[in-house]
């Protein structure tokens, strides 16, 4: 999973992710928006879920995060598409709507995102 964090023209924080993980970037940009307390809550919940049979969800306006003991899933709330309705030979492109990631990689990314926010706060 490749990603980068940068400041946009207005000084806000922008996350960009590689193909197959784009939904994570959209989720950070749309739902988290640099909220340190929310990042800390997610990291705490991940620690509680890891190695257990628990699951945890954070339902957002556009994207939602689901965590289990092995991986996370970020999914667009509007992702309800029946593939049976597609014409033969066609497929539905949903790479921008759903992404999966291992817990350790996701936690590392969140910690780097948190650090980037703290180092680049608007003065």
UniProtKB/Swiss-Prot annotation:
Protein name (Swiss-Prot/TrEMBL): UPF0231 protein PMI2039
Species whose genome carries this gene: Proteus mirabilis (strain HI4320)
Family: Belongs to the UPF0231 family.
Pfam hit, one: UPF0231
InterPro entries: UPF0231
Domain of life where this protein originates: Bacteria
